[in-house]
Amino acid sequence: MKTSVSHKFSRDFTKSCIMEALLQLMHSKDYNDISITDITSRAGVSRMAYYRNYRSKDHILMDYMCQIIKEYAAELEGPKFFSDFQTYDHILWGLKYLQKYKDYVLCLKKANRAEIVLYGLDLYMLHVTQSVEKSSLEKYELYYYSGALYNIFMHWIEDNMQEDITVIASIIYGHVQHHRFHDLHTQMENKEKNACNFDKL
């Protein structure tokens, strides 16, 4: 058990070093000019360690985006995470959380890899609604919402966050109040009631 925990810690540390090295290099070099040797030298890891964890530079950036989403989900885990993801407080919390990764987002933008942020938001939307049955059309509505969040967030970051974060959250909330997934909490409550009734049969 201790060996397994130690191995995971070692792997996570290696991945963290690689990610940090890539971000540092993205500040000073063109993304396409960054080599695997550049990354491993800056990170202080071997090429073997690199290829044990990643297939490419894009893989590093996407893996980091997934980590961000997973950590965010873990912080908000519970009924409210799944039922209230379109409330003002949740939107504001999400913006503040992403704001912490401004440097990462700007690096993605500079490298023409900003779509990785959209990829992360799409994953997030599907995750928070996983307990609700969705048709294909409803999934497209979620993609529409994540696309809107992506555009607003990216432009806000590019504008050096001149508008107060509460103003941005209010704008987003104002537009999602009438979104059909705004009734997600009701859908989940009905589903739970039906499950309870079924158990009594």
Please give the residue ranges for each predicted region.
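Helix-turn-helix
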Residues: 25-59
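N-terminal intrinsically disordered/low-complexity leader segments
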Residues: 1-11, 185-201
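Short, basic, alpha-helical segments at the C-terminal edge of helix-turn-helix-like DNA-binding modules
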Residues: 35-36, 65-73, 79
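Hydrophobic alpha-helical connector segments
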Residues: 77-104
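Basic, amphipathic alpha-helical hairpins
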Residues: 23-31, 75-78, 101-105, 130-133, ...
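Hydrophobic alpha-helical segments that form the core
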Residues: 139-179
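Basic, helix-initiating cap at the start of DNA-binding domains
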Residues: 1-25, 42
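Amphipathic alpha-helical packing segments from all-alpha helical-bundle domains
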Residues: 89, 110-147, 181
